[in-house]
Amino acid sequence: DKFAREAGMGFPGGPKIEKLAKGPELLDLPYSVKGMDMAFSGLMTAAKSKLDSGHSIETVTYSLQEHAFAMSCEVAERALAHTGKTELVLGGGVACNERLREMATIMTEERGVKCFIPSKDLCVDNGVMIGWLGHQMVSGNYEITDEDNRVHQKYRTDMVEVTWR
């Protein structure tokens, strides 16, 4: 979305970038992954610079998308390896992107782990995602005590007991 705004595409930028990302060549852009940390600021700045220097919007968006998703999949793969987890879930609006879905699916198949990608109508709205999770939890007879139903400052997603599968 940030690149799309700076390139004058407006909001939301993700779908517009995906539609344009058909460039014939992959430009050399910064790839910044350290452990499980990613930095996109240099990537965004370099992509805008490539656009400003005359590269086509299709080539720049293609290169930006490929780099950003390769970084994300690398970090996800590393997280799976370090934690021993056997499942990856994509979520949020970016999970609507077909290229990210493809890259995540390839990575998880190569690792022998499961990849869960909700239908696109469940990815575009945070309220819908939260509501769907609530539905799954209630349908799976998930119960929570008043004591557990409060804010936990250091709560981790891997602390959730998944009972609805």
PLM features: residue spans?
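Short glycine/serine/threonine/alanine-rich loop segments
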Residues: M9, K85, V113
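Residues at alpha-helix caps and immediate loop-helix transition turns in enzyme cores, especially N-
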Residues: L43, L100, G127-I130
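Adenine-nucleotide phosphate-binding core of ATP-dependent small-molecule kinases
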Residues: G35-S41, A46-V89
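Buried hydrophobic packing segments
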Residues: F3-A4, A76, I130-H135
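A short helix-loop
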Residues: D1-H55, I106, Q136-K154
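Glycine-rich phosphate-binding/hydrolytic loop that grips phosphoryl groups
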Residues: P118-V162
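Glycine-rich phosphate-binding loops at beta-strand->alpha-helix junctions
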Residues: K85-A104
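Conserved phosphate-binding/catalytic loops in two-lobed NTP-binding clefts
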Residues: L88, T105-M129
